[in-house]
């Protein structure tokens, strides 16, 4: 799992960033055009690990759930994890026999933080020659070796914290992308959409969402704003490129040990690209060291989530749509490179792993009051058969709500009045049909409230009061540039919370 990746960031999903390792996995595996996450870091991790919606599972405490590590460990698997945890306690408290990484939601890529752990013990980050994306795979390879030494099948969960802010890149990766983003976000987004259609990930007649009012046209930015934004995208691209390189090291290790063809590899992101601009601008800066970093960019987040609208946290397609790649040559019955248009969700991962791993998902636990798993096994899709989902896919983070039922999507921005879209011919959610389909709207709202009560067991959500629509939609943490903005005075020395423009 990667962190804050845009839907179109990687090559096989339309991106210009060089991701040959992921592209090869996709070419020899299966891609999903409609794989969903929860639009937020910790809640997606809960769903990935438990097969439940976050609140149903007991949120970060996991008080009503078991994890995939616990399930597969019981079935005889060697269980290991590296990277970002972002939940309560530690991975070693939830079935992982080996763990390296940080318990926090984000950290400096070069110096880490004080939450790093190795197998339940505090781990001191080295003073030099450290970068989290690389370290995650260093330890992943070590854990795979340990699994082989005890002759056990393995379950490895690698949770990269890239490309989550702070935006930090290794010098060589950063240098590779200098000069590649001078054209700006409008042209990059157009190119990505064209490539997505050419690849067949999206239909050729799809109408993309327009540039929203809070995103300035690239040619309307002043020179220093363009320079600053170019630098941010160069850094993001470098971070994503590095993730791909490290995935390549994992794949090479599996191949060397004759395990690649019979290993299920799943690649997903926890949410869409992040728009929250929480740092003052820096000019003439290279974020290739611990002292210099950038915050996220709303403009690039819009382009990176192409062709959709909105972002991390929002339950619109831009927030919840993730690349979804499965590589398993010995198990997949689909054609190499095939694309499935069947909707899937992170809640389906645990049931799928338990199904193929011949493991039982328990209904009782000595210290937790378990609730039913909401996800279903994706075996039919992997075997080139239709998938039947009896219940809609429930969508929620904080006050962003939604429901996916067949081709229809109910969605609310920050608890504002409900909107309704037919994704069969409007995946980018351009035409709100709430007024034209009042009965369908009401039925879906009632179903969302019912699931809030019966599945999540949340009275608060079930009785949520919707607010009037805000036009245009806004967020105080989105980047807002104006012609009157002055260049930062201190350039690379600028620090602190982003000031409201």
Q: Which residues make up each language-model segment?
A:
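Long, compositionally biased
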Residues: 465-470
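Formylglycine-dependent sulfatase
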Residues: 1-418, 423-446, 459-460, 471-501
């Amino acid at each position: 799992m990667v962190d804050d990746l845009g839907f179109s960031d990687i090559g096989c999903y339309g991106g210009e960033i060089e991701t040959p390792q992921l592209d090869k996995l996709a070419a020899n595996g299966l891609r999903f055009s409609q794989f969903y996450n929860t639009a937020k870091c910790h809640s997606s991790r809960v769903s990935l690990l438990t097969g439940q919606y976050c609140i149903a599972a007991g949120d970060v405490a996991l008080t009503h759930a078991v994890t995939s590590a616990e399930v597969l460990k019981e079935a005889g698997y060697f269980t290991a994890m590296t990277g970002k945890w972002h939940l309560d306690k530690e991975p070693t408290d939830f079935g992982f026999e080996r763990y390296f990484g940080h318990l926090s939601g984000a950290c400096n890529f070069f110096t880490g933080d004080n939450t790093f752990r190795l197998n339940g013990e505090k781990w001191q980050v080295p003073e030099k020659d450290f970068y989290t994306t690389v370290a995650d795979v260093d330890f992943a390879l070590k854990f795979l070796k340990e699994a082989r030494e005890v002759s056990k099948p393995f379950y490895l969960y690698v949770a990269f914290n890239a490309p989550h802010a702070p935006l930090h890149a290794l010098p060589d990766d950063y240098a590779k992308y200098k000069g590649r983003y001078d054209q700006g976000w409008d042209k990059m987004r157009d190119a990505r959409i064209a490539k997505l259609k050419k690849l067949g990930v999206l239909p050729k007649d799809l109408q993309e969402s327009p540039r929203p009012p809070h995103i300035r046209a690239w040619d309307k930015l002043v020179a220093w704003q363009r320079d600053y934004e170019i630098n941010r995208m160069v850094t993001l691209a470098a971070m994503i490129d590095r993730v791909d390189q490290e995935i390549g090291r994992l794949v090479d290790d599996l191949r060397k040990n004759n395990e690649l063809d019979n290993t299920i590899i799943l690649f997903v992101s926890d949410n869409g690209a992040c728009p929250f601009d929480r740092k003052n601008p820096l000019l003439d800066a290279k974020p290739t060291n611990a002292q210099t970093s950038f915050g996220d960019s709303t403009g690039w987040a819009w382009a990176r989530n192409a062709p959709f609208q909105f972002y991390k946290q929002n339950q619109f397609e831009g927030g919840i749509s993730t690349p979804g790649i499965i590589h398993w040559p010995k198990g997949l019955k689909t054609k190499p490179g095939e694309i499935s248009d069947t909707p899937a969700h992170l809640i389906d991962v645990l049931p799928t792993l338990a199904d193929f791993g011949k493991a039982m998902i328990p209904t009782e636990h000595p210290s937790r009051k378990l609730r039913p798993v909401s996800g279903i096994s994706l075996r039919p899709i992997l075997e080139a058969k239709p998938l039947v989902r009896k219940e809609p896919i429930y969508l929620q983070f904080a006050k962003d709500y939604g429901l996916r039922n067949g081709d229809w999507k109910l969605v609310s921005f920050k608890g504002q009045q409900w909107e309704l879209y037919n994704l069969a011919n409007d995946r980018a959610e351009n035409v709100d049909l709430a007024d034209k389909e009042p009965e369908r709207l009401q039925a879906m709202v009632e179903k969302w409230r019912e699931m809030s009560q019966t599945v999540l067991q949340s009275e608060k959500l079930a009785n949520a009061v919707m607010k009037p629509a805000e036009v245009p939609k806004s967020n105080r943490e989105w980047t807002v540039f104006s012609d009157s903005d002055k260049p930062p005075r201190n350039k690379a020395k600028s620090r602190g919370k982003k000031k409201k423009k």
